[in-house]
Amino acid sequence: MENNTAVLGAGFSWGFKSDNVMKCQEQEEQQARENEKSLNSMVANLVQAQGMDPKGRKRRLDEPTNPQPQMMVPPRKYNVSKRRPHHSTISGQPLPLHRGLELMSKDQLQYILIEVMKNYPISQQLVQNKLVDFNFSIEKCEILLKEKLQQLHESIPYSRSHDYQRLSDYAFVRMKPHILEFLNCLVDCVLDRIPPRVDNLHESLKILDMTTDMVTKLPRFQLASNNYYYDKCLEQLACLWCTVIEHIARDVIMTVNDAPLLRNWIQKLELYNELCHGILTKPLNQFKSLAVVDAGVTDSNSTKGTNATRNRWSGSTDNYTVGDNQ
């Protein structure tokens, strides 16, 4: 037992370190402290030699290089919390169909309608059926024709002579599209205001008077062939006059009661016939025959005379046909 104790040592047996071990640890700790102190002193000397202070450098980086005067902010009585801005999600959109149609101009609506009929030909019949139900007044037709006539006059090229009855070939080339547009529109309007489209023959006479007056006052050209479209339109108007006069001849009441008015129409037709160089001769003769019949209506045999007149004029315009629009 004694030998074992001497070999192992009392400190080891009971968990205590010997004095030699304690002294060695103290020496090591002291040596480490000295080494750390010497290292810190070396770093301090090195930094001082370079003129740099770690703490001061840190402060200089935090502070602005150019100090600016700070604005005094008045203290707030109440702290207001900042809210995130609310952005609206509503975006623009085009007008509804019915609202857009209300705001469209006549030209815009006409353009869209024509485009629809071009792309969908089946819609043309639908539009045509709707147009049949409409009754356009003579005043509207007159406004439309005056617009076309204004465009025709604006297309006349400048001329020093200002002679609109002897225009040149160059003027005809410039004016031809407007001439055709005006004449076609004129014939279309007249055809819409004669029987059986309308029952009032006075309206038919009124629009015939208006359109004939317009055609006779159109600017003409020095070369006779350039006036072909005018003469062709006057021939169509002559056929239309004859058609309306036939309906008047069948209307006994109008022939008797409106005799003075019919005579007034005869005087106008005579003037138009002179201006167009006799193209309206046939309808003028028909109208004059009605005036002769009207003079014999006062007799007791007025009924027979009227029937004879109606038989005489039925089919009197068989040789007249409304030509195609050029």
Curated annotation (Swiss-Prot):
Keywords for the protein's UniProt record, in alphabetical order: Cytoplasm, Nucleus, Protein transport, Transport
Biological process per Gene Ontology, one example term: protein transport
Location of region: Disordered: 51-75, 300-326
Pfam families attached to this UniProt entry: Cut8 (PF08559)
Transmembrane segments: none
Keyword Protein transport: yes
GO cellular component: cytoplasm; nuclear membrane
Gene3D superfamilies: Tethering factor for nuclear proteasome Cut8/Sts1 (1.20.58.1590)
Subcellular location: Cytoplasm; Nucleus
Keyword Transport: yes
GO molecular function terms attached to this record: proteasome binding
InterPro entries recorded: Cut8/Sts1_fam, Cut8/Sts1_sf
Major localisation: cytoplasm
PANTHER family in the record: FI02826P
Assembly with partners or alone: Binds the proteasome.
Protein's name in the database: Tethering factor for nuclear proteasome STS1
Taxon lineage: Eukaryota, Fungi, Dikarya, Ascomycota, Saccharomycotina
